[in-house]
Design a protein with these regions (language model features):
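Acidic/polar active-site rim loop that often engages polyanionic ligands
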Residues: 28-31, 57-59, 112-117
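Rossmann-fold NAD(P)-binding glycine/threonine-rich loop
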Residues: 3, 11-35
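Gly/Ser/Thr-rich loops at beta-strand to alpha-helix junctions
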Residues: 14-17, 38-47, 68-71
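General beta-strand structural signal in soluble alpha/beta enzymes
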Residues: 7-10, 35-39, 65, 89
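Oxidoreductase and adenylate-handling cofactor-binding alpha/beta cores
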Residues: 22-25, 45-61, 76-87
Length: 188
């Protein structure tokens, strides 16, 4: 679309942003159009939070926790799997990791240590549930780096319990100030 229109895009597959930027940038420049990418929740608003916190605490470390909430992009990725009728995917911060960050200890955390993912899936009648679950749990850039739980539910349960789209998260920066780096700070 960047070759035909001015575009505002909330593309959020973090691992593929450089590739997406290159493609959109080339098309927009060639057509004389303007394109703004990665301007949603994260990247986007959370990126501004990280920028602000880095200005205040230039010596430190950033941590981003998403959720608890529905990821529309991840839910859509699951809905594209053969045999899936509907899905809501929740990203959930690991409380132990959040507490470690808030302590100011600057822990090194893997993706798996920071978040879990939980999927509520309505499958088509006769679908191979084991195959669907495996495809979800091994999907690169979405689930393979996380502990993921898959629940198969019926449509009525989806409508009753998972029709909303709650979302949230937090950006935390921990760092030090002072001539001897003697003061620990946390910005949240």
């Amino acid at each position: 679309y960047a070759s035909m229109y001015n575009v505002v895009d909330s593309f959020d597959t973090h691992a593929r942003i450089p590739e997406h930027f290159a493609a959109v940038d080339a098309a927009a420049k060639k057509a004389g159009k303007v394109s703004l990418i990665s301007c949603g929740w994260d990247p986007g608003m959370f990126s501004l939070n990280r920028l602000y916190a880095n200005c205040v605490l230039p010596e430190g470390k950033d941590y981003t926790f998403w959720g608890k909430g529905v990821s529309q992009g991840h839910s859509d990725a699951v809905r594209r799997i053969e045999g899936v009728k509907d899905c809501r995917q929740y990203t959930i911060p690991v409380e132990k990791a959040v507490e470690a960050v808030r302590s100011g200890s600057n822990p090194e955390l893997t993706t798996r240590e920071k978040h879990t993912r939980e999927c509520f899936v309505v499958a088509e009648e006769g679908a191979d549930l084991a195959k669907i679950e495996n495809e979800i749990k091994t999907m690169p850039n979405y689930f393979s780096d996380y502990d993921t739980t898959v629940h198969f539910i019926i449509e009525e349960e989806m409508k009753r319990d998972h029709s909303g789209l709650p979302h949230g998260g937090m950006v935390i920066r921990t760092g030090v100030t002072g001539m001897e780096k003697e003061h620990k700070h946390v910005i949240e």
